[in-house]
Amino acid sequence: MERAAVRKKIQMVFQDPYSSLNPKRTIEWTLEEPLKSCTKLGKKERKQKVQEILKIVGLDESYGQRYPGELSGGQRQRVSIAAALILDPEFVIADESVSALDVSVQAQILNLLQKLQKEKGLTYLFISHDLNVVQYMSDEIGVMYLGHLVELGDAQEVCSHPAHPYTKALLSAIPEVEGVRKERIVLEGEVPSPANVPEGCPFHTRCKEAQERCRKEYPAPRKVKEGHVVCCHNVAKV
């Protein structure tokens, strides 16, 4: 498949709406540029497409004549989403796409992403350090540590019954709901350099359950339940 065709099918929403948009170009220019590069639409059709996509993400067509510096963080991220959707992709990578926004604005953007997913049949790869956000947005969750996938499964299953020690520690750090008490798991030691990942299980230097085998042998994926896989020597196979 040619690169141009792949670009049309796969798009990305970046983390920082303050740096992902060209401050010297209008919003209309930013949204129209991909249409010039990847479609054969005429000028009138491109303008119409830009107006339509702005409306879809909740912005008036007048925003097309504005510059990024004239917009709020939430408005900029809506423009970033519009830029990702302007070519009608099938797959969208959202890389920490709400972490730079205020909490109230985060909720608006997440709801918008869900709405667009249902309307357009999109598939998202949603990257985030916030497990509350991940659980809200995802059907499946993959937990990574130092570039290695350590647990994968249904979102509700992983969050309700985590199997990997790292996943358990992450979930224990989520603030408690009133009346619900849980033990906080505090990880000790420093995070190793991703350029020099430890031999064996990459998590063994911070894991309280680590054994000699963990220090020497990388754990193969183990099925703990249908659709739930973990890479840990200390988890029993199903």
Model-derived features: where do they sit?
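Short catalytic/signature loops enriched in Gly
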Residues: 3, 154-238
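Short helical segment in ABC ATPase nucleotide-binding domains corresponding to the A-loop/adjacent helical element
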Residues: 18, 24-37, 47, 51, ...
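Conserved ABC ATPase "signature" region
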Residues: 44-62, 171-172
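Conserved ABC ATPase signature
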Residues: 67-71, 75
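A short, proline-enriched helix->beta-strand linker immediately N-terminal to the Walker B motif
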Residues: 86-90
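Catalytic Walker B motif of ABC-type/P-loop ATPase nucleotide-binding domains
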Residues: 92-95
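P-loop NTP-binding/switch modules centered on Walker-like glycine-rich loops
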Residues: 97, 101, 105-182
